[in-house]
Amino acid sequence: MTEEDSSAKMSEDVEKYLNLNPPCSSSSSSSSAATFTNKSRNFKSSPPPCPDHVLENVLENVLQFLTSRCDRNAVSLVCRSWYRVEAQTRLEVFIGNCYSLSPARLIHRFKRVRSLVLKGKPRFADFNLMPPNWGAQFSPWVAATAKAYPWLEKVHLKRMFVTDDDLALLAESFPGFKELTLVCCEGFGTSGIAIVANKCRQLKVLDLMESEVTDDELDWISCFPEGETHLESLSFDCVESPINFKALEELVVRSPFLKKLRTNRFVSLEELHRLMVRAPQLTSLGTGSFSPDNVPQGEQQPDYAAAFRACKSIVCLSGFREFRPEYLLAISSVCANLTSLNFSYANISPHMLKPIISNCHNIRVFWALDSIRDEGLQAVAATCKELRELRIFPFDPREDSEGPVSGVGLQAISEGCRKLESILYFCQNMTNGAVTAMSENCPQLTVFRLCIMGRHRPDHVTGKPMDDGFGAIVKNCKKLTRLAVSGLLTDEAFSYIGEYGKLIRTLSVAFAGNSDKALRYVLEGCPKLQKLEIRDSPFGDVGLRSGMHRYSNMRFVWLSSCLISRGGCRGVSHALPNVVVEVFGADGDDDEDTVTGDYVETLYLYRSLDGPRKDAPKFVTIL
């Protein structure tokens, strides 16, 4: 899967540029200068008709070719007329925090939006660090856009609370709606999905990824309209309820443009075989369980390998949620074409992996559990010379579990996969030497996330802090934009980050640092920093105050289980009127003791053009 990291590349927030007051125009001063020049020459000149209108038409045509948000945001800051034209031509809007502005402000500025990407809760919500029912409601957004943008075609939501009523309103309000993607969302069920499937007759994309979908015991697959569909992508691997396979098979047959299909664990290997026979044009396949039903004795099983051979276009493979090892070799025939392979749900051993990975010479993206061990990573390093992204997740996430991957595997990857650009690596132990080798062998890294699961763990060999390893990463990887640090780290590691991490936009810290100096080094030294998330670290009010000059230009700051006082939080709130400061307990307890003692449990600080939100639950205090 590469979806989340497409999200990580969304580097510029539109809310930062959504102030309704456009930049001052220089047209009046230019006009005065022209008049003075003409008078000094003693002749009259008539200006061409509507010069501003002509220039705006030219600019409008040019901006159609400008797709980068960063570039468009820069254009909007040039002058008043450019600001106006850019707003008129903006078709796609990305909002990195749903509370950074109101729907009304969005609609006032942009009149022609066809695509909306909206994010809600911060990332630490994925680790149960945010209480349930905190917020991030989609309801006000869909209500506002339903009236303002009846031509809306695409909605991509991440960590939002979406109800079935929201989905019904969406389906009824946008007759030309084509794409719905819900990532890590909650609040809705199969009833809402059924309405979208039934009423959005031009639907091309319906992707449900890592979302909590309530089972309403409704056959939502059967709700797609009869006849040929426009579907190009259908993902429902996170739906934890059985589906009507006959209806799914018929839907696949009626979807000649279908390129991406990701099924859930209730689709057996035999059923997957039937789907592949029906849709040999697939390029991305999520296999579901990858385990066969009980085949009656004497009955011949389908030729799974032949089905994969027939799907010559497959380049992305995922799923394997309840796989049977003896069937894994069936995918061998497509391995040479694969650019993405996701085993992050499969407990695969090194000896299972090796016959597969040895044929994957073109892999760019590889995700797996740490069950592949260092031995499996060495096999990846020996074959996957084109690898750009690697993610290794823990099979057993407990801090005291045995770690099957280590610095040995990391160093092997760095030596064999020198084109690597992004890595997420969970392990129980690590060495400075392995991290330093990664920095030297893979200087093109833009994302380095090392999660040493045990708290305050030093170099596994020398017993020293991990300062030098992370220091080498920020020194040698000049393009680094995202960094996650862990293990035993002193303030010195953060001094390296502040000195060399000039392009870092996202920094995640867990159980690290000695004092407020560490936080000050980062806040004063990383000019591009947009997202700062810290947990269980000894940072207090002094460190918090060191970033006062930065917070108005950052998307958010998250501090949980640190040493921040309520008074320190209030001081930030009073000094920065465009910054919202929320404090709350980890479990959503209404008891004020969670925030009125010496330290607040959680601080969530973010910029907002429209002030504090109106839907904060009782356990959230907005200072």
From Swiss-Prot:
Pfam families: F-box_5, Transp_inhibit. Pathway: Protein modification; protein ubiquitination. It is found in: Nucleus. This is F-box protein FBX14. Residues 126-127, 394-399, 451-455, 510-511 are annotated as: Interaction with auxin-responsive proteins. The gene is FBX14. SMART domains: LRR_CC. GO terms for molecular function: auxin binding; inositol hexakisphosphate binding. Residues 54-97 form the F-box domain. The record marks 210, 426, 535 as: Interaction with auxin-responsive proteins. Residues 18-48 are annotated as: Disordered. SUPFAM superfamilies: RNI-like (SSF52047). One of its GO terms (biological process) is auxin-activated signaling pathway. Its main location: nucleus. 1D-myo-inositol hexakisphosphate binds at residues 119, 158-159, 391, 447-449, 482, 530-531, 555.
